[in-house]
Each structure stands twice: as structure tokens, then as C-alpha cells.
Design a protein with these regions (language model features):
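Bacterial N-terminal signal peptides
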Residues: 9-21
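Boundary at the C-terminal end of the N-terminal hydrophobic targeting segment
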Residues: 23-27
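Noncatalytic luminal/extracellular "stalk/propeptide" segments of secretory-pathway proteins
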Residues: 28-37, 48, 60-175, 180, ...
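Acidic/histidine-rich, surface-exposed loop or edge segments in extracytoplasmic proteins
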Residues: 37-43, 55-67, 266-269
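Extracytoplasmic/secreted proteins, especially bacterial periplasmic and envelope-associated proteins
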Residues: 41, 54-57, 61, 76-87, ...
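Sec/Tat-exported extracytoplasmic proteins
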Residues: 50, 54, 59, 63-73, ...
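Soluble metallo-hydrolase cores and metallopeptidase-like ectodomains found primarily
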Residues: 133-168, 244-364
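Conserved small/polar residues in nucleotide/adenosyl-binding loops
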Residues: 366-369
Length: 370
């Protein structure tokens, strides 16, 4: 039997279909249709406030100088942010903290002892296209919370420096105990790499960015593209943030005067006992290329144009020396508060670090600017 769909049914179906995209377009997860309209109106008002010119000026001011935590340049950025917040009508203030931090007393030493002697650079080469890269206040490459140490030992390449990598080395008959390991950045936090190296008996750890992960194998390098150039290294903390973050001497508490401090021996549960040193990949290549020993286990090959070997023999020996100046140093948080109209017993905390290992245009001044 032939069924005939009535014109009225067709009209109703058409109307439902026509209005469905509009209804979907007006909804936002977590909001009713009416509330979604209000939310969009507020978002449009918010988006109308930022101006590219003011953002550019804020970024210029915040990145004018290298400003490592606890330095006068860091304090200057704190004052600038506080004053800007006050100009917006907020009651912003500076909060001081006394935090145990390290700076290098002298340039770290990474020296190839065998098969030839060569002292490697621990400073990044300046770029002609970027005058800021030659700023005299840029520190040598170093890792926050790395230990002081002076060791000479055979070198082992341990890939990303994670537990499966050490398992692969053990299967290849390579023991890292009493040796210096060189590992590449990636696949985990650098503090994990330092701890795993120490736990396996290594006496030192060198960390570099392999061009396979962050360099020419990924695309054009800076200044032509966004990837890491050959003479660039990655600074950063090697604190065991997975144990606890913040000041190592005041776990779980604010590092303010009057807060009890734990002993340095206790703090070693949160920071390495061995020297840890970052290196640019043009220098790291000089350490990896002469390695002998077993050929690379699966997944160990990077982007250098030669087969990676893991070493572990006396064919390649390295001298690693770090001399750190640890002290309690003053840091400054900028704190402002906006009281809401509803749910006054609940807090929304928005935070971001302001200090930087160098200029901080990417990490993290762009967030302050926005």
C-alpha cells in the first residue's frame, strides 16, 4: 500500500530542521539557551577590552632584561605588574617569600677528556639577527636545584633517561653506576631524568635537546622558524616536583619568615645530590658521536647523522663540574583580589610565574601580558 506524506508533516519537519542549527548554535555546555546568550554577551564585552598595542607594550616592559627569580630585574617586573594592577583599580600588593635557590658561582665545566681533550661551551652563541641573544646578563646554561659536584667518568647515552631506557641499557649489558649519563629532553619532566639517573647510580647527568625532538628535524630553526637552533640549550629546574613543589626547605607551607625549615639532608628527598647540566645540541653531538659500546637499542636513535651508540666504555670520558651558590633569596608575588557578587565563600585562584630563565617572552610573560 502506498503511503503519502501530508504537506503539513513536511512543513513541520522542515521547520524543525531549519531551526535546529540555530538552537544548537545558541547553546554552550553547562548553560541553558537563555544563559548561553548572556554568557556570549559577557564574552564579547571581555574580548573588546584587550588592545594589541597595550599588550605589546606590557610584553616589552616585562621582557626588557633577563630576570631570573630573586634578582633585581625580577623585582622590577614585580613592581611593574603591581603598579599596572593598581592602575586598573585593584588593590594589588607585593608578598615576599624567602626561598632556597641556586645560581652558578662560575660557569659550569663540561669537558671531553677522551678520545681527545676539548672544553665544551656552556653558553649559547648569540645570533646576528637577534641582538638580545648577546645580552651580558644572560647566565650560562644551568639547572635550578642541581647539586655542586666535580666528577670525571665514562659517558653513557641513556636516551630520554627514563626507567625503560635504563632497562634497555641493562639488557645491552651497560651499567651506568659510577658513570655520567647524557640524556635528551622530552617524554618527561627534566627532574624525573635527574632522579632516575641518580637512582641508577650515575654520578652526573647532562641533558640536551636532540634535534629530533626540538631542532632542525622538526622544521626551520630560529630565527627562520620556531624550532631550537643548534647553539641553544634548555635551562630549567630539576627539583623533584612530583615529590612536592615550592621551596625545598618548607614543604607544603609558605616560605615566609617564621615558617620552620627542614634540614638540607631532608630536602634531598626533593632535589638531586648529583651535578646536572644542560647543553646545547651542537656541543652534545661532540659527546655522543665518538661513543662506542653496544649499538642503540630500539628508539634510542636521534636526528644526528650517525648511528647512536650507548657507550659505557673508557673510550669516551667526560669531566663535569658545577659550583652552585645556594642561599635563601627573596622572591615577590604580586597579589590582587576581586570580590565577586555571589558565592563569597568560594575562591577562584589565577596564577602565573613572572620570573624567567632569560627574557621570558614565551615562558611566561605572554600570559601576564594577556
Amino acid at each position: 500500500m502506498r503511503h503519502v506524506r501530508s504537506p503539513l508533516a513536511l512543513v513541520i519537519i522542515f521547520l524543525v530542521s531549519a531551526f535546529q542549527p540555530l538552537a544548537l548554535a545558541q547553546t554552550i555546555d553547562g548553560f541553558s539557551a537563555i544563559k548561553a546568550q548572556d554568557e556570549r554577551r559577557l564574552e564579547e564585552q571581555f574580548r573588546a577590552v584587550p588592545q594589541s598595542a597595550s599588550a605589546r607594550e606590557h610584553l616589552r616592559r616585562l621582557t626588557a632584561e633577563p630576570h631570573i627569580a630573586g634578582t633585581p630585574e625580577d623585582y622590577a617586573t614585580a613592581v611593574y605588574v603591581r603598579d599596572q594592577m593598581r592602575s586598573f583599580g585593584l588593590s594589588a600588593e607585593l608578598k615576599e617569600y624567602q626561598v632556597w635557590l641556586n645560581y652558578p658561582k662560575t660557569d659550569p665545566v663540561v669537558e671531553l677528556i677522551a678520545p681527545r681533550r676539548e672544553k665544551l661551551s656552556v653558553r649559547e652563541a648569540g645570533l646576528r639577527e637577534d641582538p638580545t641573544s648577546s645580552n651580558a646578563k644572560i647566565t650560562p646554561l644551568f639547572n635550578g636545584y642541581a647539586a655542586s659536584g666535580d666528577v670525571t667518568a665514562p659517558l653513557v647515552y641513556a636516551n630520554y633517561g627514563l626507567p625503560p631506557d635504563y632497562d634497555a641499557l641493562a639488557k645491552a649489558g651497560v651499567d651506568v653506576k659510577g658513570k655520567i649519563v647524557i640524556v635528551r629532553y622530552g617524554n618527561s619532566f627534566r627532574g624525573v631524568k635527574a632522579k632516575v639517573a641518580q637512582d641508577h647510580g650515575a654520578v652526573g647527568c647532562i641533558i640536551y635537546s636532540d634535534p629530533a625532538d626540538d631542532g632542525y628535524a622538526q622544521g626551520d630553526v630560529y630565527p627562520k622558524g620556531p624550532w631550537r637552533p643548534v647553539a641553544s640549550g634548555q635551562r630549567g629546574s630539576v627539583q623533584y616536583l612530583f615529590q612536592y613543589p615550592g621551596d625545598p626547605l618548607t614543604p607544603g607551607k609558605p616560605a615566609i619568615p617564621g615558617t620552620p625549615r627542614i634540614s638540607l639532608e631532608e630536602a634531598y628527598a626533593d632535589i638531586p645530590r648529583i651535578p646536572v647540566q644542560p647543553l646545547a645540541y651542537d656541543e652534545a653531538r661532540k659527546l655522543i658521536e665518538p661513543l662506542k659500546g653496544p649499538a642503540r637499542p630500539r628508539g634510542f636513535q636521534g636526528a644526528f647523522p650517525f648511528p647512536y651508540h650507548v657507550g659505557g666504555t673508557n673510550d669516551v670520558r667526560v669531566h663535569l663540574k658545577t659550583d652552585m651558590d645556594y642561599a635563601s633569596r627573596t622572591l615577590w608575588d604580586v597579589v590582587a583580589r576581586i570580590d565577586g557578587r555571589e558565592e563569597s565563600d568560594r575562591w577562584v585562584i589565577l596564577g602565573n610565574h613572572r620570573d624567567a630563565w632569560v627574557f621570558g617572552a614565551v615562558d611566561r610573560s605572554e600570559e601576564h601580558t594577556s
